[in-house]
Amino acid sequence: MRGSAISSLFVFNPTLKPLSEHPTEDEYKSCKLIYYYPENAPLFEQHTHVGLAEGMCMFVQQFSDNPLESIHTEKHTHILQQCEPNIWLCIVLNHGDSPSESFIRQQDLETHPHVLKAIVDNYYRNFYLFHGPLTNFRYPEDFPHLKNLLSDYTKIFDEDQPKRTELFEGFAYCPLDRKSYMNVMYGLSQISFTHTDVLHTMLIYDGYIVNTSMPQQGSLLVYSYLARDKNWRRLIDMKRDLNPNACQYGRIAEYPKKGFVYGKNSAGIIVPTVYLPDIPPCKMLLWVQENMQLVLLMKNQEVPEETIEVIRNSLHELCPDIIKTIQSQYQRVLNSEDSFKFLYFNNMNLAIKQSSKLNPIDDQLYRLILTVSAQMRDSTQKYDSLVKTIVRTNIAWVMAVKVLDSREIYFVLPPSTAPVNKVEEEIVKFANGYFHTIFTGL
Amino acid sequence: MEHTKSFSKKKQFFVFTSAGKPVWTRYGDETDLTTFIGSVTAILYNFQQYYRGEQDTLRFIKTKDVNIVFLCTQALYYVCVCKNNETIESIYQQLGMLHSKVISTLTNNITTMLISRPNYDARNLMGGTHSSLDCMIKTTARCLHFIKGFGPSRMPLNQRNMIASIFKNNIHSDVVYGFVMTTNYVIYRYTRKNVGLHHIDAALLSNLITSYISLRSTMSWTPICLPHFSDEGFLYTWVTLMQESNIFIVLLSDNASAFKELKTCGNAIEAELESMKLVVEESIACMPHPVYTFDVKEVNHFVYFSKYYDQFVMSGTHPANFVHLPELPKEHYQELMIRYNQAHSFSEYAEYYKGNYTKVDVYRNELVVCIRNQEYELLASMSSIIPINTCVQICSQLCKTLKQEEPNLFIPK
């Protein structure tokens, strides 16, 4: 969600009890609170907010068996989610002061349920990626360390959150023809075949995913961290030192022209443990060469230096061919400009395709497409689903199509006084050419 | 406990003071809900002061299947817990109308009183209003929140002009507003020079006529506050029901002592209207409008709002009337309202609407169009198999028909 900073963020477990023999009321309140941001908030305020969040969860139980999702005020949106058994995360977004006579507010265009859920999920999953579940931290001995990790992580999250520009969480797939793809697969399978310690691989080229053997959710997490929206550049700019005791999110070595980012490099041996859904915790190696990023998830909990060196030698040998195969195709597609502004998203394989003309998306258009998408998602849960919509506003024409309930395509045209049928005709003409392999129903 | 029964209702309303004193609840007894209301008041207060030095206001809370919407005025708070699929804006409008009804009953003096005496128990002041509040909620829930007008009955212009002449010939200077109306429809309205009629005030008056059966049995003189005329005091309403008919003549005056004058005026109007009674009843009998009367076959339903008249026309049903023609079953109307809201929603944001807006939503079983410009707003429902270019032509034809028909559809200014 663009533009909205975090006012506060806290993690709490209402079941925790103080350990002292005769705890005070403040001790009862303090022990529930695992972490609060900003840390300089008055203690009284921190306790009140946790108590209020707990109270609100109980309040809505009188009316619904479903948990509380969000609380909307004029200036803030509070998102609450139980991320693990007995552990709740609350994020309060600040929308600033935008007085309005009517009930609606501009933030309503961005605070759709799935967007709010994505913010909380994003926070939790990226912490989980490097540190695993919060329940792994024992109370009370591990809690000071947990607090430090969350403190370190949350500051980065707060800086990063408003800069996130993408509309959908998914993969930008690298444009490869079948033959090239098979050649790349051959190269990757050589790596897996030679090094049986390698559990999974993921190949990314210039931010586009080429192939992954991980389950979808794990792939999405790793891809989001390393590649989506050119995130590796943001990670490099963070310049976080390689402190093994701090939160590992964003702590990467410099990207060499060729070599390991996670593995053995000039900074030493850095091989983080990553926690991914549906995969046991494993070590992650990251090899970069020119525009390529190759992720290797290792089976074993320890990856000795010798193993890293053996893998390095293999990659020296195999990667040039892989890169050459991808590069020529990629350059050809990159240099071609799309004639239309469009955005494609597939809910099944999470593929995203954004036309070159639609980059970047300004804030007004972002909110428009986001809300159209929310309307399309919302309708499948309730009544007969919305399959197509065309809207003229003073900033743009947007036409959205939902195909077979899994694919969404958004077309954008500049504002005009043309009648809606003419606009549709123009879009259909383009779509029938460009998306000829997909049944769009247009 | 009693209050748990009321919590299981699909849509529950609570009205209470800023001090946590219950004033009204749609279901259950306010007394049983004192603890609950106290907790809600505390929640509202905590969110108002969530961050020290910053004032904020709670708007709504969401779970997957429940929306809880809040309206905080100076001294009175309104909360709705809604488990059906109504939009937040629609629920908020219902809360707004509840507040208008409270002010209509008590004037804004209630606000002044509650500010100076926060612990005052206002429950008794709202005694006897339960059915009218409930009726107001039901009617408002059937309205589209963005249509800021009222829906009169259809009548040929020359006949409405005849009613206008009757009023002109017999009106007294003390009359601020005059109406010929039924419990559901306004047939004619008169306003004193330089006085406008706000659609909320029209709705409050309609609610008064609908809710109080006693007004139908005999000529009545009753106070009502119309907040958009003035929320500080009452207007005095002379109401009579024409003999053997469901047509009311309603005159409102700002002069509390004008009963005799209004009675004379009203009786004269009634006498002259007697000759037109059949014509008036005919105009009511043809409501709600079947869609085919507008000569556009492909349209299943429409709502048309004229910005010049500040009035709307709807086919198949009318928000004030719970009758549904076979072409528009009640369940489909509820779904359609949500779809109309969705089609209209972007135009409610200043960044997307600058006087020209169109949206076409195609569902599997329906096509919904919203056209909004500086002259009118049109929402229409058609079959989803109609191509967009045909849909455009249909809408264009419908707008043309409605524009031509406007003098007969709406009460002239």
Task: Label each residue range with its predicted role.
Chain B
Residues M1-K413:
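Intrinsically disordered, Ser/Thr-rich regulatory regions of eukaryotic membrane-trafficking proteins
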